[in-house]
C-alpha cells in the first residue's frame, strides 16, 4: 500500500518552510507592535461551541465540520473550523477580563473544514488573526482594520481594496431579513439551490453568492444600511473617520456580509485582484453578542479578523515577494580530510553550536570534493578545510565561499570570528 497525503491536505517541506517562517515571523511582529499577545487553544472543542457560536444555519456548521464521538457515551467533538469561538470560550473560561479590561490576543493556528479543495483552499489549512475583546468603541474596530492592512503592507502586498459595511444590531438585521425575503420571493424560482436553502434559514447570506446569474437580483436587493439604528450609524461613521484620518482608502459596500452568524455592526474584507476569482485576503468584524450566545451572563464587546496563510503564500509567490527570502544557511561548513580531522571537527562543531553559531559538517563520509559541493549547496558563508597538517600546526585556512578570500587563523581566532559574525547578524 502506498501512503499519501489525504485529499485537501498538504505537506510543508523543508524546501519551502522558510517562506512560512518569514510570513509567521512578520505577522507575529506586527501583532506584537500593536500590543497583541499570542493565544493557543486545543485543536478540537465541543461541537456545541461551534453550533451555538457560529450558527446552525451557516455553511460551516451545516456541512463543513469534522465532528466525531470518541465513544458512544461521550459528547460530540469537532476539529476547529474557525478560531473566534474557541478564543471567546478561553476568554470566558479563564476570566481574562480580570487581567485586562481590553484583552488583545492573536493566533496562528491550523483550521479544518470539509471544503472542495482548490488553489489556496484546503481542508486542513492555516489562519492568522486577532481578537480585541472588551471594547465596544469604534477605535477598536479601526485599530483591528489598520493592523490587518499593516500586515499585508509589511509583506509587500499593496494592491488591495478594503470593503466596509455595517450589519447593525439584532433589530436592524431582523427588519432587513424581512424586507429581503419580501424582495426575493418573486425571484425565488431564479435562485440556485444553495440560495433557495438560505432563503428561509439565513437570507442575508444570499447577498454573498458568487453566482454571476444572481448578480442582477442581488444588485437590486434592499441594503442593510437602510435599516440601521442610529447608534450603529454613528459607530460606523466614526470607524470611517478614524480610517480616513489614518490615510487608509476603503469602499463602503452595502452588499458585504459575513458567513458567520455572530457578526454585528462593523464588517470588513480585504480583497485583491491578484488572487483571481477567490479574491478575499482577509475578513472580520464586530461580534458583541457572542459571549452571551456562549452562555455568559454579561456581553463582551469584541472585534477581530482572520486570514488564510496558504492564500497569502500564493499571492506572494505570484508577486515574486520571496526573492530575498532564503533558507537559513550555515555560517561555517567544516570539511575534513582524515579520521582524526573528523573527530576534531565533530567536537569543534558541537562547541560552536553551544555558542549559538550555525555550523555544519558532513555526516556521510564523503570525499573532500563532495563536501565542498555540499558547502556550496547549503550556501554556507565560510568553509574550513581540516587535515592532519592543520591539526599539527594549529593554523587553519578559512575561506569565504562567495569571494574566495582566505585568511589563516588559529583555533581560538576561528571561535572569535564566528562569534563576532553571529553577533553582527543578530544585531
Swiss-Prot record:
Domain of life: Bacteria
GO cellular component: cytoplasm
GO terms of biological process kind: histidyl-tRNA aminoacylation
InterPro entries named in the record: aa-tRNA-synth_II, aa-tRNA-synth_II/BPL/LPL, Anticodon-bd, Anticodon-bd_dom_sf, His-tRNA-ligase, HisRS-like_core, HisRS/HisZ, HisRS_anticodon
GO molecular function: ATP binding; histidine-tRNA ligase activity
Gene3D superfamilies assigned to the protein according to its UniProt record, in alphabetical order: Anticodon-binding domain, Bira Bifunctional Protein, Domain 2
Record field: catalytic activity: tRNA(His) + L-histidine + ATP = L-histidyl-tRNA(His) + AMP + diphosphate + H(+)
Gene giving rise to this polypeptide: hisS
EC number in record: 6.1.1.21
UniProt similarity note: Belongs to the class-II aminoacyl-tRNA synthetase family.
Protein name per the record: Histidine--tRNA ligase
Chief location bin: cytoplasm
First-tier enzyme category under EC: ligase
Annotated localization: Cytoplasm
Keywords per UniProt: Aminoacyl-tRNA synthetase, ATP-binding, Cytoplasm, Ligase, Nucleotide-binding, Protein biosynthesis
Subunit structure: Homodimer.
Amino acid at each position: 500500500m502506498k501512503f499519501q497525503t489525504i485529499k485537501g491536505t498538504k505537506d510543508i517541506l523543508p524546501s519551502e518552510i522558510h517562506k512560512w517562517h518569514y510570513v509567521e515571523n512578520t505577522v507575529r511582529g506586527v501583532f506584537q507592535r500593536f500590543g497583541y499577545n499570542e493565544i493557543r487553544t486545543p485543536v478540537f472543542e465541543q461541537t456545541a461551541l461551534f453550533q451555538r457560536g457560529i450558527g446552525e444555519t451557516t455553511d460551516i456548521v451545516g456541512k463543513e465540520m469534522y465532528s466525531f464521538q470518541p465513544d458512544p457515551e461521550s459528547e460530540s467533538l469537532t476539529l476547529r473550523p474557525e478560531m473566534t469561538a474557541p478564543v471567546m470560550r478561553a476568554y470566558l473560561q479563564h476570566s481574562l477580563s480580570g487581567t485586562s479590561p481590553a484583552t488583545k490576543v492573536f493566533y496562528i493556528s491550523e483550521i479544518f473544514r470539509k471544503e472542495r479543495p482548490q488553489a489556496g483552499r484546503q481542508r486542513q489549512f492555516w489562519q492568522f488573526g486577532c481578537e480585541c475583546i472588551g471594547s465596544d468603541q469604534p477605535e477598536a474596530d479601526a485599530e483591528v482594520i489598520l493592523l490587518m492592512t499593516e500586515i499585508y503592507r509589511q509583506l509587500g502586498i499593496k494592491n488591495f481594496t478594503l470593503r466596509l459595511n455595517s450589519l447593525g444590531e439584532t433589530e436592524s438585521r431582523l427588519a432587513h431579513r424581512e424586507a429581503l425575503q419580501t424582495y426575493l420571493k418573486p425571484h425565488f424560482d431564479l435562485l440556485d439551490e444553495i440560495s433557495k436553502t438560505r432563503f428561509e434559514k439565513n437570507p442575508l447570506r444570499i447577498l454573498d453568492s458568487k453566482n454571476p446569474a444572481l448578480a442582477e437580483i442581488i444588485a437590486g436587493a434592499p441594503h442593510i444600511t437602510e435599516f440601521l439604528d442610529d447608534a450603529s450609524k454613528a459607530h460606523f461613521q466614526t470607524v470611517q473617520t478614524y480610517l480616513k484620518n489614518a490615510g487608509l482608502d476603503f469602499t463602503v459596500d452595502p452588499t458585504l456580509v459575513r458567513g458567520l452568524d455572530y457578526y454585528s455592526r462593523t464588517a470588513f474584507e480585504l480583497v485583491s485582484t491578484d488572487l483571481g476569482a477567490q479574491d478575499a485576503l482577509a475578513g472580520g468584524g464586530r461580534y458583541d453578542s457572542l459571549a452571551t450566545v456562549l452562555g455568559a451572563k454579561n456581553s463582551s464587546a469584541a472585534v477581530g479578523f482572520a486570514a488564510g496563510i496558504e492564500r497569502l503564500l500564493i499571492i506572494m509567490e505570484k508577486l515574486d515577494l520571496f526573492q530575498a527570502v532564503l533558507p537559513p544557511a550555515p555560517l561555517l561548513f567544516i570539511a575534513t580530510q582524515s579520521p582524526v580531522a573528523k573527530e576534531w571537527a565533530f567536537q569543534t562543531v558541537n562547541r560552536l553550536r553551544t555558542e549559538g553559531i550555525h555550523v555544519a559538517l558532513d555526516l556521510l563520509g564523503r570525499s573532500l570534493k563532495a563536501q565542498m559541493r555540499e558547502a556550496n549547496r547549503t550556501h554556507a558563508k565560510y568553509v574550513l578545510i581540516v587535515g592532519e597538517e592543520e591539526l599539527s600546526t594549529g593554523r587553519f585556512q578559512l575561506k569565504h565561499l562567495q569571494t574566495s578570500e582566505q585568511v589563516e587563523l588559529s583555533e581560538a581566532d576561528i571561535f572569535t570570528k564566528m562569534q563576532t559574525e553571529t553577533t553582527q547578524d543578530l544585531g
